Amino acid sequence: MPFMDKQGVTQMPDLLRWRILACLAPALSFAALQADDAGGWTHYGGSQRGMQYSALDQISRENVATLEEHWRFRTGEMGQNANHPFAFQANPILVENRLYISTGTAIVIALDPSSGREIWRYDPQIDRAINYAEVANRGVSSWIDAAAERGAPCRHRIFVGTLDARLIALDGTNGKPCADFGDNGEIHLDRGVRTERGEWVVYTITSPPVIVNGVLVTGSAIGDNQK
């Protein structure tokens, strides 16, 4: 926040100024170094910058009106036994010729992008009887171990966060949890976090994590005005 001196002139403390610059520098460097994945959609929002843009030009303003539906897929997730309405908000990603989506309850599904055929499905089995502050999941993240041989278990990993604050790693090939990640494929992020477990669960994960230089970074969602 700005500060004012005795003359009423707005000042910014040196410490705060340097903190802002320190935050901006890596952000600018990251944006300068990262290029959109030409022809792909390997991250939430299309690229590591989340620009929601593709350089492909096969579909344009001139021909978009002539497109026809090729296939349609239904997740089957209708919020059965849930105490709170939820919405489908996922942004699919396309990696190694597979389409990955997630439902509002963090069920992860891998599809054949050519036919819409379901290849595998993973259900984290969240407790649907609980009132979550927000019932949504906006997608998954993908990471490929460049040092692993092609075909090795969990060479390609799909990460998803859950409403009960778990971070789960799945084998992109078959959807099985990666046993070497956390506790048999999952980490409970709410352990050690002081939250009041009352009528509502206020600490959840609704957005996909970000992976930068081999480091997995995840945020969280909290429920407002629930107390």
Regions found by a protein language model. Name each.
Residues 19-31:
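Bacterial N-terminal signal peptides
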Residues 41-45, 85-105, 132-166, 201-226:
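Repeat-blade elements of multi-bladed beta-propeller folds
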Residues 66, 96-98, 105, 114-115, ...:
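Residue-level recognition of short loop/turn positions
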Residues 75-93, 104-106, 110-147, 191, ...:
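Blade-loop segments of beta-propeller domains
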